[in-house]
Each structure stands twice: as C-alpha cells, then as structure tokens.
A protein has these predicted regions:
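Terminal regions of secretory-pathway proteins
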Residues: 1-159, 163-164, 182-504
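Short acidic, glycine-rich surface-loop motifs adjacent to enzyme active sites
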Residues: 177
Length: 504
C-alpha cells in the first residue's frame, strides 16, 4: 500500500475517508437569510495579498500555548468530516430553501460527539487494524504512530497524520488509553459496573478528554463572561441547555455549519508559519517537506517534538505561544501546497473559508449575533469599524463596483475574527464566537448519552489524581468562574500519556 498524497486541513476532501455518514450538517438558524459573496469580494478579503494576509508575521502572540492549535485540530477531526460539499456555491441553489435542504442532507462522516472515534474507530472488532489486543496500536519505537508497510498510519482518521504535530497528538491519545488500561483500570473493581476492562479504559480516556475540551481548551480561548454563562448551564442538568442547538428529526445530533464552517475555523488565525520541534530544530515551517512536517510518512527520531516548546510542561521553559486571535492569517496558510488548481485564491485558506460559508448559506455575523442575544447569551452586535482595517480600501473598491455593503452584513467568519480582535485585543475569541463554540460543544456534552457531565455533577466521577495531580481542586464554582484555574489541562494528559516527569 502506498502512502496517500498529502492533503491538508481545509484544502481538499480527506483521502481514505469513504465511510458511510453517521450524521448530517444543519443550520442553527435556518430562518435567517443566507449571505452570498462573490469570488472577487472573497479574494479582496481573504485571498493572497488581501486584507487578511499577514505577509511579515508581525501579529502579536496570544496567551495560548502553541500545542492547543493542534489539539483543536484534533478535536475538529473527532466531530466533523465533510467529503462532499463544494468550495463554490451551486448556481442552482441560490434560493435559501434549496441551500438549507442541501445542508440538511450533507453527510458528516464523524459523529457530532466528543467520543474519540478518530482514535477508536468502530471498536476492536470492526476496526481491528487500530488495535493491539485491548491496547491502541502504536509504533514499535514508541515515538510514532503504528504504520502499514507502505507508511500509512493505522489510525481512525487519516487526516490526523497530515503533519507531525497533530500526529503526535493522535499518538498521545493512543498512549493515554494504554496507560490508563495498564495502570489505572486494573486497580479498580469493575466487576459490578457492567464495564469490561477495555470499556472502562475507553470511558476514562473519553471523560478526561471531554473535561479538557470544556475546562481547558474552551475556557482558555473563550470570552470569560460568555464561558461562565454557558458553563453554569452545561454543568447543571436541571437547567435548559443548549439554547438553540437540537437533535434532528431522526433524533441524531447534526453538525451546525455556523460552527463547522465559521466559528471553529476562527482557530486558523492562531497558526504561525514556523514552530520549534526540539532543541535541534527550533524553527521549522509548518509545511516543510525537507523536515517531513507534511506528514503521511514515518517519523524520524530526530524530528520527535519536544513538548516543552508546545505546552507548559516545564517551569524553566516558556512554550511558544499561538498567534493572536485577529483578522489576519499567517503567510503559510495563504499559499497552501494544494494540488489540482491553478487559481492562487484556492490556495488561500481564508478565501476558502469565506467561499465555503457562502456556498453553505450562512447568514451574516450581525444577524446571528442578534439571534444569539435573544437566546440569552450576554453579547451585543459588534461595530466592526471596517474602515479602520488596514488595506480595507481595496475591499471597499470591490464592494463599490458590486453595490454590496458588508458593514452591516458581514460574512460570519470575518465578523468573528474582527470581533475577537476588537473585544479582547486578540487574546481570545469574542463574545459571539465564544457563544457559538459553547452552544455546540456544550450541546454535545449535554445531549450525548455518555459524557462526564452527569457523573461529575452527581459526584460519581472526578479526573484521576494520578493524571491531574493529587492536589487538583475540582470545585465546580472555581472551574466555572475563576480565570486561570486549570486543575486538569492538556499538559497533564500529555505528561501522563508520554510518561514525562515534571520537567518534560
């Protein structure tokens, strides 16, 4: 078997992902009028040389360690996979009804739940190639994913081998399951619980993952006021939540395109052009073929990442931080190594995001902000001050020719980026972006059948002290309301999974 051609996030349909859909996509607000933009407008905003192009990498840092960029990508691959929608609008689907019908039938090959199906696949019997007995398969040297003789990673989602960093996140979750299985589950009496030892290890792995998504990743990147508002409802099963996300007519959770095509893609702005791999390779381009960061091949030992450069694992080593949450993209993301198109715009991820949102019939940021406000979220429509955006005159000239006014009807994706920049100075998501993330992630945690929320609320589950540390404080009030209180974070999972000591 030959290794697949590299295929990167947001570029093309995922290779090797031809399974039947397990769910569909949807609109949170199907009654809102879709906002359509032209290719010229999308290019002026998000194309090469457009207002979103950060040529010189001059954007400041956020306060989010760089490892969270790839963890967020891993989470995305756990809940969404669209292999059939087009980048450009269907000329026969301009009517809102047709767009909504198309989206409602658009298949999602991932389950809209934080169940780690990108790790576990369909289980040991249906996906035996992912397993080594009741362990998750890992490479013989312990530093790489298990691979076929041709180099293909044996994992639940081939996208998680598209670069070194996400591949190592995937490996960490294999190792986390294995260590929980070996060292934690056997110590507990599970004979009366109905769980097998494998099932108990899988459940613990999922619960720790879900906890970190809510109380580390989302708490870290979301507006604090919006986070507290949503988390108080997510963690109290007596309160109604989610407020607008709901199951479809088949009683399945769909994936809202406002989330998958706009809100979660704001995370692309966190990406830098270069990252430190380890002490020998302190500046490696994200898509550097010479260093193999393109993925889809075995990992040389010299390129094993030192996690201290990515997460706060060592008090003596300051990890690299992600780029600020603002309305510009790193140069690497504006010239993706895409195959099969001579259109320079198609290589710009920001352009692609804008065009895909238009094709899927997303409403404007202002319209969605009004709807989320009426649902109770603590937010207002943001004045984006577009006239003060650097190089906006180029966009204004294009808009003048087409007679379009984006100041009051801004594409949701760009609205969320600009909102983040204005609301927090680029430190985190703005209020609407935060509300959309928490509505959907919180909805998954409340509406899916097996998450940590109910056992945590009743006191029947807490994160393992051998993973979080013996002094970790999981008081719900502190978790919800206290900034910078992270008793279990991504660094703890990585430290335990990879058997690192306190200094990495």
């Amino acid at each position: 078997m030959t290794a697949p051609t590299p295929c990167h996030h947001g570029m093309a349909k995922a290779r090797g992902c031809s399974q039947l859909a397990v769910g569909t996509f949807s609109h949170l607000f199907p009654e809102l009028k879709p906002l359509t933009i032209t290719e010229d407008e999308a290019a002026a905003i998000g194309g090469p040389g457009g207002v979103m192009h950060d040529f010189d990498g001059a954007s400041p840092d956020s306060m989010v360690p760089a490892g969270y960029i790839f963890f967020a990508q891993f989470v995305d691959h756990d809940i969404t996979l669209d292999t059939s929608s087009a980048l450009r609008p269907d000329p026969d689907s301009h009517q809102a009804k047709k767009v909504h019908e198309f989206v409602d039938h658009l298949g999602n090959i991932r389950s809209a739940s934080l169940d780690l199906d990108c790790v576990y696949g369909f289980g040991p019997e249906a996906s035996p190639h992912l397993y080594d007995g009741e362990h998750m398969a890992v490479g013989e040297n312990g530093i790489d994913l298990a691979r076929s003789p041709g180099g293909t990673a044996l994992i639940g989602d081939p996208r998680n081998d598209e670069n070194i960093f996400i591949g190592q996140i995937q490996l960490a979750f294999h190792q986390l399951h294995n260590r929980i299985f070996d060292e934690r589950v056997y110590q507990r009496d599970i004979t009366d619980t109905g769980w097998t030892r494998f099932g108990a290890a899988q459940r613990e792995t999922r619960y720790h993952y879900q906890f970190v998504v809510l109380f580390d990743l989302l708490k870290r990147i979301c507006d604090p006021k919006v986070f507290t508002f949503a988390a108080e409802r997510i963690c109290n099963t007596k309160k109604d939540f989610p407020l607008c996300y709901k199951r479809d007519k088949h009683d399945k959770l769909p994936m809202p395109v406002e989330f998958s095509t706009a809100a979660y893609r704001v995370g692309h702005t966190m990406v830098r052009d270069r990252y430190a791999l380890n002490a020998k390779h302190r500046e490696v381009e994200l898509f550097d073929e010479a260093f193999g960061t393109l993925g889809f091949s075995a990992l040389p030992e010299e390129l094993v990442p030192d996690w201290r450069f990515m997460l706060a694992l060592d008090p003596c080593v300051t990890p690299h931080m992600s780029k600020a949450f603002n309305a510009v993209f790193a140069n690497e993301l504006m010239d993706l190594p895409i195959v099969g198109s001579n259109n320079a715009n198609d290589r710009a991820l920001a352009f692609r995001n804008l065009m895909r949102a238009s094709a899927l019939g997303l409403a404007s940021g202002q319209a969605i902000a009004e709807e989320m406000k009426t649902k109770g979220y603590p937010l207002d429509v943001t004045d984006l001050k577009l006239g003060k955006v650097k190089k906006w005159k180029r966009v204004a000239d294009v808009l003048h020719k087409s007679g379009t006014d984006l100041s009051k009807n801004t594409p949701l994706f760009y609205y969320l980026l600009r909102e983040s920049e204005l609301a927090s100075g680029g430190a985190r998501y703005g209020p609407l972006g935060s509300a959309l993330l928490l509505e959907v992630f919180g909805g998954m945690l409340r509406l899916c059948k097996d998450t940590f929320i109910e056992p945590f609320e009743t006191g029947n589950w807490r994160p393992d002290p051998c993973i979080a540390g013996p002094d970790a404080d999981f008081d719900k009030g502190r978790l919800i309301k206290e900034p910078d209180h992270y008793p279990l974070d991504l660094a703890d999972l990585v430290r335990f999974a990879k058997r690192l000591d306190a200094t990495g």
